[in-house]
From Swiss-Prot:
GO terms for biological process: amino sugar catabolic process; N-acetylmuramic acid catabolic process; peptidoglycan turnover. Homodimer. Pathway: Amino-sugar metabolism; N-acetylmuramate degradation. Residues 56-219 form the SIS domain. Belongs to the GCKR-like family. MurNAc-6-P etherase subfamily. Keywords: Carbohydrate metabolism, Lyase. GO terms for molecular function: carbohydrate derivative binding; carbon-oxygen lyase activity; ether hydrolase activity. HAMAP family: MurQ. It holds the Pfam family GKRP_SIS_N. Its EC number is 4.2.1.126. It comes from Synechococcus sp. (strain JA-2-3B'a(2-13)) (Cyanobacteria bacterium Yellowstone B-Prime). This is N-acetylmuramic acid 6-phosphate etherase. The keyword Lyase applies.
Amino acid sequence: MAWDPRSLTESPNPATAEIDRLSTWELVKRINAEDRQVPEAVAAQAEPIAQAIDAIAQRMRHGGRLIYIGAGTSGRLGVLDAAECPPTFGTSPAQVVALIAGGEKALTQAVEGAEDDAEAAARALEGLHLQAQDSVVGIAASGRTPYVLGGIQAARSIGALTIGLACNHPSPLTEQVDIAIAPLVGPEVILGSTRMKAGTAQKLVLNTISTGVMIRLGKTYGNLMVDLQASNAKLKQRAERMVALACDLDPAAAAQLLQACDGEVKTAILVALMGCSAQEARQHLQQAQGNIRQVLDSVLAQRR
């Protein structure tokens, strides 16, 4: 794959051309100055990010999945974001999935040639039984990675939603997806080291997409992660704290209520705020597809 002279991520950075001559303190300040460009580049993509969130959420309401595909750093960031969704938002591991070129081995070491296999992602998506209601997010700093492009083409062929996240535009990726997200962070501190500014931008965008989708799906109440899975002591304490905050209860009362509701944060909150039984709370949640805000707004409207 020849070097593209239009590629920002592969261009030399004049601000760091002699970074090896700087003192360590100056080096740190120079890298920090470059990093400050990243949030602005991401903020400039607010519109397509919001479009992606709404489109993904709409499909997930009807059984669709969110699937990330990437290679190298981009792939690892997708895996990281997908892995955090079950403990944070109580999703099934099958709802948010990440595919990385080279498979699990590529999480900890480079797998030579994996990103150049344009058919590999298509095969992996076929193994997931990709459906039209799924959403596929291709992540590639350059916007040219064959593994990602092949996966996007496979997704488009069956009518799945396609989203491209790249730090170059125009690029083959951003030009063939339904929604293009392109935070242009400029040349890297070290030429071509896209684990730096490009990777940081990708992480911020993925954070926003997954969090925004889960908020739209009712996985939060305010800023409380009310669908979390309390799988360890820290998360159990967090669940108790969320019930206490949402219902203005002391810690002991919140813990007791949560235990009585089998550890279900949403159920406990509704029991406290609505004065109903746990079973009634579960029924309300089922009718509202788990959206606690929708349940409370509906009940308040009926009581007016």
